[in-house]
Amino acid sequence: MPNKEPLRIALFGAHPADIIFNSAGTMAVHTARGDKVLAVPVTYGARHCNPFLAPVKGAGYRPLEEVKAKKLEETKKACKVLGAELHQLDFKDQVFVGSHEEIQEITDIIRGFRPDIVITHHPTDTAFADQPDHATVGTAVMRAVKYANEWGAESKKPGFQVNTVLLWPAHHDTAMYRVTPYITPANYYVDISDVIEIKRRAMRCLEGSMLVTEEAANAAITGMGVFWGGAAGVPHAEVYVYTSPFVVKHLERREIGPHRQMLLPPGWTLAQYLETFGE
């Protein structure tokens, strides 16, 4: 159903895949409602993903500009599937520090797009030092959100206050830590059950740079999506950390969806769990 008052949502990810993997469903839900969604990968992730682009994994490295071109092509395809706009920045991944100039450029995007909601990484998300860009980008975006409303900011664009910031929870490497995939608790769930196939299509657009096979896409969707959906009582969900106080006039009764289930490790069935740990 179209939204009578369209939202403007900006997603800032360290790498293009971060935005698609974490929020493709949310993006699809909102573009279908008539909302305006802007994806902003802060880097191409060319250094991090370069080995994946080698003819055989680990067989060598390709020129960065070649990798960037490949990733940009893939990201454009994914955003087209999702109905989102793309603003690709060109900061260096793996060594992104969140300098004044980098924060200023992010600030200008916020002031220009004027989003109601900003989505980015949790500032503590280093994935056990494997992904330092996550935390650094999250911190830089949080600073830019504040800076966007500072009248002394070095920008020709008018100031703007972002009212809502959602964070992707800080996480373990889920391939290694399947039982506890996030180390910061999610408290905001988006039901993406109706757009799960759109998310799958968007993820498959990244198959060149991240080796996203059909099997990997299915694992991400039936693993984490179902895992968090079970926690929320829906078939599939994407999760966030809501950073602002949530105020209500009074407490309300809440119905739990029919898919409420035991929180199993991603990809596990109840039978597997019982066989491993017993009843």
Language model: regions and residue ranges:
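Metal-dependent de-N-acetylase/amidase catalytic core
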Residues: 1-10, 85, 97-279
